[in-house]
Amino acid sequence: SGGPESWFLSVSRKMKGPYYLLTTDNQNSLAAAMEILAYLQANGEKGEILHGSPSHIAKDLRNIYLAHSAKARLSNMRLGVIGDAVERIASLETPEAVRHACGAELVSIPTEELFAEIRLGGYPMTEGVRALLEKGYDTAEMDKALAVYGALRRLCDRHRLNALTVRCFELLKPFQTTGCAALALLNAEGIPAACEGDIKSMVSMAVLWALTGQPGFMAN
């Protein structure tokens, strides 16, 4: 209602922003919220007015909840960078920049650690793996591709990774395979996985997973 500005000032000192100002259609509520928002903006704080029909406000509140839930999930995520990050300048990002943007931690893992796991061989017989094997693809090629999958799964467990990116083309010469099948399986399992050492694509996929709970896939 009107006249809550001084009350808001006393409360806001005890709470961190951003601030969401829920209004009604009477008692000068919107005008009071606009005055508070102007104060916040003048002091470098973030705020938003929620105004409209109950269904419109309910939709806004749901979106706010989803965004804050996603931010909380991202802040606890460990994102694996296997091998050197790709040389493309548009794909480069520093650990500090990622941490500042979403709170996630970049974890560097040497390529040789992945290679050692691939040579070790083996993979879990998941539902996705079983479905691939039933397609009747060349057995030798499937074994090579799934060895990469098993290796990446073990790295995820060892380093507590929630997402990863890997230099797939570095697998071609020593193993005559790529990471495409492995990354597809990981994405389907809820582990965002990007190729070419592309950090920004990995972070984008992690953000989309945190927001929607749905898997993505990195196109060329």
Question: What role is predicted for each listed range?
Answer:
Residues S1-N220:
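An N-terminal assembly and electron-transfer interface module characteristic of large anaerobic redox
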